[in-house]
Structures are given as structure tokens and as C-alpha cells.
Swiss-Prot record:
One of its GO terms (biological process) is L-valine biosynthetic process. One of its GO terms (molecular function) is 2 iron, 2 sulfur cluster binding. Functions in the biosynthesis of branched-chain amino acids. Catalyzes the dehydration of (2R,3R)-2,3-dihydroxy-3-methylpentanoate (2,3-dihydroxy-3-methylvalerate) into 2-oxo-3-methylpentanoate (2-oxo-3-methylvalerate) and of (2R)-2,3-dihydroxy-3-methylbutanoate (2,3-dihydroxyisovalerate) into 2-oxo-3-methylbutanoate (2-oxoisovalerate), the penultimate precursor to L-isoleucine and L-valine, respectively. This is Dihydroxy-acid dehydratase. Signal peptide: none annotated. NCBIfam families: ilvD (TIGR00110), PRK00911.1 (NF002068). [2Fe-2S] cluster binds at residues 51, 124, 196. The keyword NADP does not apply. InterPro entries: DHAD_IlvD/Edd, Dihydro-acid_dehy_C, DihydroxyA_deHydtase, DiOHA_6PGluconate_deHydtase_CS, ILV_EDD_C, ILV_EDD_N, IlvD/EDD_N. The active site is at 474 (proton acceptor). It comes from Polynucleobacter asymbioticus (strain DSM 18221 / CIP 109841 / QLW-P1DMWA-1) (Polynucleobacter necessarius subsp. asymbioticus). Binds 1 [2Fe-2S] cluster per subunit. This cluster acts as a Lewis acid cofactor.
Length: 564
């Protein structure tokens, strides 16, 4: 029988480890504890953001359940960045970087202390992929516990979420909203703890982790403030101890087939563009053969069957009441769009987990549809290619009145410059805004363009203006927007060669993003282009810029390292 402390005994057994044990005795350990599995609890609690401010109760529940199940819990902290608070500022450059820092910090503690398993608890966007990357890297038994969604806010009879506040800025600047109502939206959009409530990035990733098999059924759509979320954290800890006993490891669960399941669910629920970047990073960490083209392959197979914000109607709490991710998965499974034989952290297969879930969603709900009555016949996250982005870029293409647009480029070398022009109402119908030098290396950090896109929506330009960037978009973004353009401007990608007024085409049907300039002219501009000086030469952002891969490879920092 496998020893449950197979890893941790490296620091607890033998005469030579007497000093090591002394450190544990200082924290109240007893001799009998050294034969128990030592399980880390990666606790993302902080008062930086409502996404993470409700995590301590989940960590406490996990610790209690671990100890009751015969493990010894070891709690350590992981950092977070609030995308909603950093949005539109230089601070947002740290958001994607924090994904790498979170993965690194968990790897440090799990491997540095020889932990036998780990419960990862996170809330805000980058907590999710950062934690999963660490689980894939370390490959010790692990489970992901999502902190839970926020509940909707209300003002003047209207249901609100954080994107309501971003869009209200544009409504105010265009004279469509009073200052009093702007303040009202601001104060009521976020009523308590939990991650942003639509199918934005955090809820997209939590849903995908449930489909991946690394989180418990129904856990991804629970509200943070509800008692069932605490109970789910405790159950997750108990399940993790069983995984330690059975030596069930992340790479047994995270396979190409289970990633296909996860991406199928992302398409079905209308998830965030960031999921493309993050699953490229997760599969890289798990050493799975996965490329940006795999998303397009699955998009063509899987319809959108869940009506969720930002482009739809409902929030995660509504999805939970309608049957949650298991209901979505059962519909996909019955339609031959999921692999039912994939193992989950529970030890059961996907098919076994979904055995008792109804094949048809309840008639009294409107959130989840059937395959023969989808919102859209194909998925919404399309991979566009063309001379602007030969490596591929990402667009949300469903729900657009005008899936194709050709117009004059309005070129900005930073988000800040673009936002100033939008706020000054200098962007008009038919324009295509180009925001560049915001890529992994050039930004650095691929800031999310929620502030400019929301301002355009608030000004009534969401359907008539295109936006192209080598940065990212928030999960709350909608409209004719294309992100993750690769190669990025900083390395001389064609996006760096677009001039003000150039004709640019975005065609969702043809999956095309094109600069309508002759090849000879592009070659001439490329020969004249000079790489700008890096914006940072010391510190974390400089380190990230020097190590980051292309967005088409996940913008990770441990790929193709020069170790000579």
C-alpha cells in the first residue's frame, strides 16, 4: 500500500531530520502527525478585491475537513490582483503577470515543503489558471476550489454587475446618463463578496475546471455568500484526501480529451476570450499537445446553448438555479460532444458523475437550451488569421449585427491614448481602433481593454466600431473586438506597421483580419520599423517581458527557455 506521506517524509523521517521536525513541533505538531499526509491549502484570501474577500471561510472549512479526514493541513498564501480595480491603469499590466506569480508561488510551497497534496482556493481571474498551471506542473494530488460568484446588484429596478459600471462611464460621457445615476450604478453594482457575476473570465474558468474534472460538480456556479459554498469547500478537501490515498494526480485527469471537454463547455456557455490564452498555458504546463487551432476545431462542433452575460441575458447565479454546469455537460454528453470516459478528481468518470442529471433542462428556466434550439449553431470564440495576425488572434463572433467590418484604422500605441480619444468622442461609426504595444512583451502584460470597449458600448458604438489589439479583453467585453494579435507589435508584428487611416478588415465569417495594403508597402514599412525601447528595465514587469512567449503560445514564462 502506498504511504500517504510519500513526499512529506522527506522532511520528517530519520535522525537527520530532527531539526526539520523541531520546526513542526513549534507549530503544535505531535509525533503522530508525521505519518499523516501533509496537504497544502493555497489560500488566495485577501481584502484587495471582493473576488477574494470571502475566501477565508472556505480555507477554514477545508482545513477542518482535511484534519478530520486524517491529513495535516498546511496553509499558505497566494497573491492576487484585482482586474476590476486595476483596469484602465498601469496596474493592469500586473494582472496576467500575476498568473505566473501565482503558479510559481504554489509550486514553491508544494515542492519546497514536499507536500503530499494541495487544495487550491482562488477567486479573481488569474487565480484560476495560475492555480491550475501549478497543479499541472507539480503533479501532486490536487483539487481546485473556486471562491464563488458574486450576486447581482440592483438600482432603480435594474439588475447590475461590474460591467454595468464600466458601461455607465460611456453613457455618462455621451450624455445618456446623469451624474446621479452614474453614482447610483457605481454604488450598487457589486453588493458583496464573490467574483464578477456574468460568464466573464473567473466564471468561465471555474466552469471549465468542473468540466476538466478538477473541481467538484456544481461548485463553479455557487455564490460565495451562500452556505453551500462552504460545504463544497469542505467536501473538496475530503475528496482530495481520497485522491492522495489513491494516488490520483492532476496529469491523470488533465489530458487532451479532458481539455477538449473543458473547451467544449467554454463554447457552450459563451465564455471569455481569456480562456484561449489560459488553456494554452495550462496545456503547456501539463505538457499536452494543444495549439490555438484546436479551439477553432471545437468551436465549429459545439453550439452556444447558455444565455449568459456579457453578450446574453443571465448571470452565474441564474445558471446555478437552472442546473449548473452538470446540466450543460449532460446535454453535450448526450449529443456526443463530450468524452464521458474521462476520469475526475472524485475517482468517477464524467459519464458516472452525470448519470443522474436529466437529459433535458427544466422547462421553468430560460438559461440553458437544448442542442436543437441553441442560441448560436457554432461556438463564439473564433480564431482569426490574416496578414495582421498570421499566428492567430481571438474574437467573440456571436451576437454581432455586423459580423464583417472594413474601415479606417485609428491607431494608438497604448490603451491610455485610445481611452483619451474615446472619452473625447473622437471615434466615429465605422472606425477600427487599433491599440498596440500592449502585448505580452510590449505592454508588458497584455492589459485588458474593458475600459475602452465599455466606453464605446456606453456611447452607442459597440456594434459599429471595430477594435484590434495585441492586448487582451475582459470576459465582460462584447462587440466587434479582436485581441491577442500575434506576433505582437513589440516584436515587429504587422500590427506595428498599420498607419492612421489604413483600410482594415475584420471578417468573422471568413475568420479574417487583414490590413488592406500591398505586400510591397508592408515590406517597405517593415524594413523601416525599429523596435522601441522596453518600457521597464528592472523589476517584475521587466522579467516578464524578457521571458513571455507569444500570446499564441499562452504568454507563459517557462517555454523555450535558453538554459545554455
Amino acid at each position: 500500500m502506498k504511504r500517504l506521506n510519500e513526499r512529506s517524509r522527506m522532511v520528517t523521517e530519520g535522525v537527520a531530520r530532527a531539526p526539520n521536525r523541531s520546526m513542526y513541533y513549534a507549530m503544535g505538531y505531535e509525533e503522530k502527525d508525521f505519518v499523516k499526509p501533509m496537504v497544502g491549502v493555497a489560500n488566495g484570501h485577501s481584502t484587495i478585491t471582493p473576488c477574494n474577500s470571502g475566501l477565508q471561510k472556505l480555507a477554514d472549512a477545508a482545513v477542518e475537513a482535511l484534519e478530520a479526514a486524517g491529513a495535516k493541513a498546511q496553509v499558505f498564501g497566494t497573491p492576487t490582483v484585482s482586474d476590476g480595480i486595476g483596469m484602465g491603469t498601469e496596474g493592469m499590466k500586473y494582472s496576467l503577470v500575476s498568473r505566473e506569480v501565482i503558479a510559481d508561488s504554489i509550486e514553491v510551497c508544494v515542492n519546497g515543503l514536499w507536500q503530499d497534496g494541495v487544495v487550491v482556493i482562488g477567486g479573481c481571474d488569474k487565480n484560476m489558471p495560475g492555480g491550475m498551471m501549478a497543479l499541472a506542473r507539480t503533479n501532486v494530488p490536487g483539487i481546485y476550489v473556486y471562491g464563488g460568484t458574486i450576486k447581482p446588484g440592483h438600482f432603480k429596478g435594474k439588475e447590475l454587475n461590474i460591467v454595468s459600471a464600466f458601461e455607465a462611464v460611456g453613457e455618462f460621457t455621451s450624455g445618456r446618463l446623469s451624474e446621479e445615476d452614474l453614482k447610483g450604478v457605481e454604488q450598487h453594482a457589486c453588493p458583496g463578496s464573490g467574483s464578477c457575476g456574468g460568464m466573464y473570465t473567473a466564471n468561465t474558468m471555474s466552469s471549465s475546471f468542473e468540466a476538466l474534472g478538477m473541481s467538484l460538480p456544481y461548485s463553479s456556479t455557487m455564490a460565495n455568500v451562500d452556505a453551500e459554498k462552504v460545504a463544497s469547500a469542505a467536501e473538496s478537501a475530503r475528496v482530495l484526501v481520497e485522491a492522495v490515498k489513491n494516488n490520483l494526480r492532476p496529469r491523470d485527469i488533465i489530458t487532451k480529451k479532458s481539455v477538449e471537454n473543458a473547451v467544449s463547455v467554454i463554447m457552450a456557455v459563451g465564455g471569455s476570450t481569456n480562456a484561449v490564452l489560459h488553456f494554452l498555458a495550462i496545456t503547456s504546463a501539463a505538457e499536452i499537445d494543444w495549439t490555438i487551432d484546436d479551439f477553432e476545431r471545437i468551436r465549429k462542433q459545439v453550439p452556444v446553448i447558455v444565455d449568459m452575460k456579457p453578450s446574453g441575458t443571465y448571470l452565474a447565479t441564474d445558471l446555478h438555479q437552472a442546473g449548473g454546469i452538470p446540466q450543460v455537460m449532460k446535454i453535450l454528453l448526450d449529443g456526443g460532444l463530450l468524452h464521458g470516459d474521462c476520469i475526475t478528481i472524485t475517482g468517477k468518470t464524467i459519464a458516472e458523475v452525470l448519470k443522474d442529471v436529466p437529459s433535458v433542462p427544466r422547462a421553468d428556466q430560460k438559461v440553458i437550451r437544448t442542442l436543437d434550439n441553441p442560441l448560436y449553431k457554432q461556438g463564439h470564440l473564433a480564431i482569426l488569421k490574416g496578414n495582421i495576425s498570421p499566428e492567430g488572434c481571438v474574437a467573440k463572433i456571436t451576437g454581432l449585427k455586423n459580423p464583417s467590418i472594413t474601415g479606417p484604422a485609428r491607431v494608438f500605441d497604448s490603451e491610455d491614448d485610445a481611452m483619451a480619444a474615446i472619452m473625447a468622442q473622437k471615434i466615429k461609426d465605422g472606425d477600427i481602433v487599433v491599440i498596440r504595444y500592449e502585448g505580452p512583451k510590449g505592454g508588458p502584460g497584455m492589459r485588458e481593454m474593458l475600459a475602452p470597449t465599455s466606453a464605446l458600448v456606453g456611447q452607442g458604438l459597440g456594434e459599429s466600431v471595430g477594435l484590434i489589439t495585441d492586448g487582451r479583453f475582459s470576459g465582460g467585453t462584447w462587440g466587434m473586438v479582436v485581441g491577442h494579435v500575434a506576433p505582437e507589435a513589440f516584436v515587429g508584428g504587422t500590427i506595428a506597421l498599420i498607419n492612421e487611416g489604413d483600410s482594415v478588415t475584420i471578417d468573422a465569417h471568413q475568420l479574417l483580419i487583414q490590413l488592406n495594403v500591398s505586400e510591397e508597402e508592408i515590406a517597405k514599412r517593415r524594413a523601416a520599423w525599429k523596435q522601441p525601447k522596453p518600457r521597464y528595465t528592472r523589476g517584475l514587469l521587466a522579467k516578464y517581458a524578457s521571458l513571455a512567449s507569444s500570446a499564441s503560445k499562452g504568454a507563459v514564462t517557462d517555454l523555450n527557455l535558453d538554459l545554455t
